[in-house]
Amino acid sequence: MKTFALIGGSGYIAPRHVEAIKHVGGDLIAVLDPYDGIGYIDKHFPNASYFKETERFDRHLDRLTRKGKAVDYIIICSPNYLHDSHIRLGLRYSDNVICEKPLVLKHEHLESLRALEVGNKKIYTILQLRLHPIIQKLKEEWREGWT
């Protein structure tokens, strides 16, 4: 079973990630969010450790890694301006970081993240709202206007 940690567990898009983790048979073992709106996650993963402070979350992931129980995937659902630092945190403790778009706000940050993808370390991006009905309608209207 693959293990997951989630940064930004109380955000708008987080429930979709929680459902996806459950759908693939994964186990959400750690969640970071400064707001304690975690009831949804408790319902699906009652044993997940919850942290309000980044430092404690960092320490928890470090402890798991030293015990040989490193997290398989770290998912970033935090506000856009935090993506860069959260991706860096994720790559310290996992080979796989999944981040909603945009990965970063500045091009030079993208280049520095690319340099961190060494060995098995990978950063994946998700277009989390691409199937949202409003986005689909906008896409359809755009196509109709250009055909």
Locations of the language-model features?
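N-terminal Rossmann-like dinucleotide-binding module
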Residues: 1-47, 69
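Short, conserved SAM-binding/catalytic segment
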Residues: 41-48, 112-118
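Short, well-ordered alpha-helical microsegments
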Residues: 14, 38, 83-84, 106-107, ...
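A contiguous active-site-proximal alpha/beta segment in oxidoreductase catalytic domains
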Residues: 104-147
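Local beta-strand N-terminus motif with an aromatic residue
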Residues: 28, 71-74, 147
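Beta-loop-alpha module in the N-terminal Rossmann-like domain of NAD(P)-dependent dehydrogenases
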Residues: 49-114
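Short, well-ordered alpha-helices that flank and scaffold nucleotide-derived cofactor binding pockets
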Residues: 19-23, 88, 92, 115, ...
